[in-house]
Swiss-Prot record:
Monomer. NCBIfam families: EF-Tu (TIGR00485), PRK00049.1 (NF000766), PRK12735.1 (NF009372), PRK12736.1 (NF009373), small_GTP (TIGR00231). The gene is tuf. The lineage of its organism: Bacteria, Pseudomonadati, Pseudomonadota, Alphaproteobacteria, Sphingomonadales. This is Elongation factor Tu. Residues 19-26 are annotated as: G1.
Length: 397
């Protein structure tokens, strides 16, 4: 029989494995590819050694090691990210280098939740990972069923304490190693299939960029004699049609205007959509009323803010970051989308200073408002060089 051609006609979803060191994240990743490859559907088995030697990538100047595997179930196509070290997870989640629409939290039944289990759940909450599914691994190392129940209760309480729905989250018990070694199918292969069924069902299908509200960060502003003002940029989400009303948000008071023309590659279009680099002609807007760093957006869809809480990774000296710590009242530039805005940092009460290589949650007060929602990524810069990366976790004002 000829090999079936791989067609991506299924919805796509990005997931990853998170959890404490040595609880079995990479083994589970390999086991998923093995079990699904054997189940058919054009999947390829990727062994542990190949996932473990993750290539180093540079994202916004930060060195991150990540492994990417892909597989599909009957209902979805997945891109799955696995990181070798704890620091890689922290950097990955904060920079959004590998976007996660959901995650599989791996907890060893023998150890229960450990410090990095907590930290990864907290990070998932802070950076806005929408849903988690739990794989309780190494159940063959625990003889007492009551102990397994206790560990499950502990995991559910921990999830609830970080505002995840601990009572509802699916927890699948099994052994990733048993699945890899073709032993004990009940906790091996069957458990992996149950896990993927839970992931299919419980992790919501992400909204495609095209289906979201229109947003375009403004990169440049031109005035074209006899036509008016044109702003250019890459449409991040949604669609804008000629004749639609939009808002210009950020840096100054929000203004409404109408898009009277959309141009791409010097051709006139009826609309611009997510991914397009366009020029938008704005009715009755003076060249001086709009600037780089603002966004064009569907009216009412996004608001400007100056104060927020953020989860931040501070680059190490080796990554080209600072060589010295910084303290409260540190005033760097915050680079959002297309521009820098100065902001002042407020550290948590128990933190005196922040060292290069740290990750930390702190408050920021900008000198000018930026269009933002929780989940927006930014870089921290000093004199044009990146010294940190962050994500807005909540908006204060």
């Amino acid at each position: 029989m000829a090999k079936a051609k791989f067609e991506r006609n299924k919805p796509h979803c990005n997931i990853g494995t998170i959890g404490h060191v040595d609880h079995g994240k990479t083994t589970l990743t390999a086991a998923i590819t093995k079990v699904l490859a054997e189940a058919g559907g054009g999947n390829t088995f990727v062994d542990y050694a190949n996932i473990d030697k993750a290539p180093e990538e540079r994202e916004r100047g930060i060195t991150i090691s990540t492994s990417h595997v892909e597989y599909e179930t009957e209902t979805r196509h997945y891109a799955h990210v696995d990181c070798p070290g704890h620091a890689d997870y922290v950097k990955n989640m904060i920079t959004g280098a590998a976007q996660m629409d959901g995650a599989i939290l791996v907890v060893s039944a023998a150890d229960g939740p450990m410090p990095q289990t907590r930290e990864h759940i907290l990070l998932a909450r802070q950076v806005g990972v929408p849903a988690l599914v739990v794989f309780m691994n190494k159940v063959d190392q625990v003889d007492d069923p009551e102990l397994l129940e206790l560990v499950e209760m502990e995991i559910r309480e921990l999830l609830s304490s970080y505002d995840f729905p601990g009572d509802d989250i699916p927890i699948v018990k099994g052994s990733a190693l048993a699945a890899l070694e073709d032993k004990n199918p009940e906790i091996g292969k069957e458990a992996i299939l149950s896990l993927m069924a839970a992931v299919d069902e419980y992790i919501p299908q992400p909204e495609r960029p095209l289906d979201k509200s229109f947003l375009m960060p403004i990169e440049d502003v031109f005035s074209i004699s006899g036509r008016g003002t044109v702003v250019t940029g890459r449409v991040e989400t949604g669609i804008v049609k000629v004749g639609e009303e939009v808002e210009i948000v950020g840096l100054r008071d929000t203004k409404k205007t109408t898009v009277t023309g959309v141009e791409m590659f010097r051709k006139l279009l009826d609309q611009g959509q997510a991914g397009d680099n366009i020029g938008a002609l704005l009715r009755g807007t003076a060249r001086t009323e709009v600037e780089r760093g603002q966004v064009l957006a569907k009216p009412g869809s996004i608001t400007p803010h100056t104060e927020f809480k953020a989860e931040v990774y501070v680059l190490s000296k080796d990554e080209g970051g600072r060589h010295t710590p910084f303290f409260a009242n540190y005033r760097p530039q915050f680079y959002f989308r297309t521009t820098d805005v100065t902001g002042e940092i407020t550290l948590p009460e128990d933190v005196e200073m922040v060292m290069p290589g740290d990750n930390i949650a702190f408050g920021v007060k900008l000198i000018a408002p930026i269009a933002m929602d929780p989940g927006l990524r930014f870089a921290i810069r000093e004199g044009g060089r990146t010294v940190g990366a962050g994500v807005v976790s909540s908006i204060i004002k």
